[in-house]
Amino acid sequence: MKIVLATGNKGKLREFRQMCQDEVLPFSDLLGMFEIVEDGDTFAANALIKARTIYNKLKEKHPEEAYVVIADDSGISVPALGGIPGIYSARYAGEGASDKENLYKLIDTLKEKDFKSTPAYYTAAIAIVSDLGEYVVHGWMHGNVIDEARGDKGFGYDPMFIPAGFDKTLGEMDDGVKTAISHRGKALSLAKPIIQMLKNKEKNASDLK
């Protein structure tokens, strides 16, 4: 059974590989790189769109193979700004915007509102699609966003987000600390037993053949 990650984001792939003991393949290794239209209105809907798209294409190409496709949709929400960027976090500065462009647009928005620091939270939805069903789990991380970028670790909005109980941004933290507290880490801790269950069921089914 192959575990395939439905993302082309190198930062996300690195995080998933750190958190998973199994080898995780980016979908581009099997299908080549292409864009997936994410037109859902929630993180969960977008994660499912990505996972289903990759799963269906893999099964068309290799119907005899067993796959577990994992997709995550995540973003940051700032209540004082009406919840933005939310599900538009990856394209807050426009379609095709870089992480840096999105980051500095949110920093500029905070400055325009004269917010030095304000509460915010990350959401991660992980969708799991296989022959044996579909599942979605969530994880959250609360803290504050600040009107400057600090640190060069992580990706996305990490350099402006300070998790609750810490005085450093995610961009200043080592990967091990970040993984232990991150929204994606929390969601993946719920996804892992589901993935293991699917692997066990697939193995049992193979043994009976």
UniProtKB/Swiss-Prot annotation:
Q: Name one GO molecular function term.
A: dITP diphosphatase activity
Residues involved in Mg(2+) binding: 73
Which keywords appear in this protein's UniProt record, sorted alphabetically? Hydrolase, Magnesium, Metal-binding, Nucleotide metabolism, Nucleotide-binding
Q: Which InterPro entries match?
A: dITP/XTP_pyrophosphatase, ITPase-like_fam, RdgB/HAM1
Under CDD domains, the record lists: HAM1
Question: Matching Gene3D superfamilies, A to Z?
Answer: 3.90.950.10
Q: Does the keyword Magnesium apply?
A: yes
Q: A GO term (biological process) for this protein?
A: nucleotide metabolic process
EC number(s) per UniProt?
3.6.1.66
The protein's matches in SUPFAM superfamilies, at most eight in alphabetical order, are given as: ITPase-like (SSF52972)
**So what does this thing catalyse?**
XTP + H2O = XMP + diphosphate + H(+); dITP + H2O = dIMP + diphosphate + H(+); ITP + H2O = IMP + diphosphate + H(+)
**Family matches, as PANTHER family:** INOSINE TRIPHOSPHATE PYROPHOSPHATASE, INOSINE TRIPHOSPHATE PYROPHOSPHATASE/HAM1 PROTEIN
Q: What is this protein called?
A: dITP/XTP pyrophosphatase
* UniProt source species: Sulfurovum sp. (strain NBC37-1)
Q: What is the lineage of its organism?
A: Bacteria, Pseudomonadati, Campylobacterota, Epsilonproteobacteria, Campylobacterales
